[in-house]
């Protein structure tokens, strides 16, 4: 009887820790990592200031990127605040996109789309503004659905959800995504009755792929992490500036 109890307890413990249910094949098709605590202290803890992963447990180091006591989501958009006043206007987003290398047409369409969709939720008043500003201190109000949940509802960074992007979707390379994998991932993230989230999520990932894919057509993990805290934008803009200056000389 005692042996039966031990076996029974072992089964219960095993089931309690299982991330796969045989009756739900999708749980096996999209596995989650169970080893994160070997690499990241408390990977389930939302990080307010830094975007951490197994390769960067302290977040972005070196370079010019500083968190400045802004949430990771605020850092994500601050690159586009050209004058540093805490408010992003459509023309600032347009200029930021141009600095990143997008052409005039794409920059115009994306800037209009972003501010049309995200401005109103961030306004400090119920009255809309025809200038369509985005207030950085309220950017968490503009978080849309059907996403990876790497940002929580307050704009903090969730390491466990970031790592699960790759455990669930990276089939060709463990730390990179193909365009097809991105397309399938954004399909899998779609929530019911959330057309805005469907379009926004897919559009953001396709733009990121266009911006940061490598020579082999993969989107690297480090580039994805960098876009979450905005350090990728700063790096790419700086590289383009150096390249332009090099051509002049």
UniProtKB/Swiss-Prot annotation:
Annotated heme binding sites: 76
EC number: 1.11.2.3
Chain ranges of the EF-hand domain: 68-103
pH dependence as annotated: Optimum pH is 7.0.
Cofactor dependency: heme b; Ca(2+)
Compartment(s): Microsome membrane; Lipid droplet
Catalyses which reaction(s): RH + ROOH = ROH + ROH
Activity control mechanisms: Inhibited by beta-mercaptoethanol and organophosphorothioates such as parathion or terbufos.
InterPro entries xref list: Caleosin-related
Any single Gene Ontology cellular-component annotation: lipid droplet
Enzyme's top EC category: oxidoreductase
Thermal characteristics: Optimum temperature is 45 degrees Celsius.
Entry text on domains: Transmembrane regions are predicted by sequence analysis tools, but these regions probably constitute hydrophobic domains associated to phospholipids.
Name listed for the protein in its UniProt record: Peroxygenase 1
Organism: Avena sativa
């Amino acid at each position: 009887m005692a042996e039966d109890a031990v076996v029974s307890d072992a089964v219960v413990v095993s089931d309690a820790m299982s991330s796969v249910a045989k009756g739900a094949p999708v749980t096996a098709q999209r596995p989650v990592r169970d080893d994160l605590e070997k690499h990241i202290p408390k990977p389930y803890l939302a990080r307010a200031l830094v975007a951490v992963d197994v390769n960067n447990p302290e977040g972005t180091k070196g370079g010019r990127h500083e968190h400045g006591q802004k949430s990771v989501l605020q850092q994500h958009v601050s690159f586009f605040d050209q004058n540093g006043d805490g408010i992003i206007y459509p023309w600032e987003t347009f200029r930021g996109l141009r600095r990143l290398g997008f052409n005039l047409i794409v920059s115009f369409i994306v800037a209009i789309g972003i501010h049309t969709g995200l401005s109103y939720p961030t306004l400090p008043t119920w009255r809309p503004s025809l200038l369509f500003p985005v207030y950085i201190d309220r950017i968490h109000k503009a978080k849309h659905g059907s996403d990876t949940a790497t940002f929580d509802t307050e704009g903090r960074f969730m390491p466990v959800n970031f790592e699960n992007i790759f455990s669930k979707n990276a089939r060709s390379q463990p730390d990179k995504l193909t365009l097809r994998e991105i397309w399938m991932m954004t399909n899998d993230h779609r929530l019911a009755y959330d057309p805005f989230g469907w379009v926004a999520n897919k559009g953001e990932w396709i733009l990121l792929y266009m911006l940061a894919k490598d020579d082999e057509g993969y989107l690297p993990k480090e580039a994805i992490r960098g876009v979450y805290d905005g350090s990728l934008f700063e790096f790419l803009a700086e590289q383009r500036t150096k390249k332009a200056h090099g051509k002049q000389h």
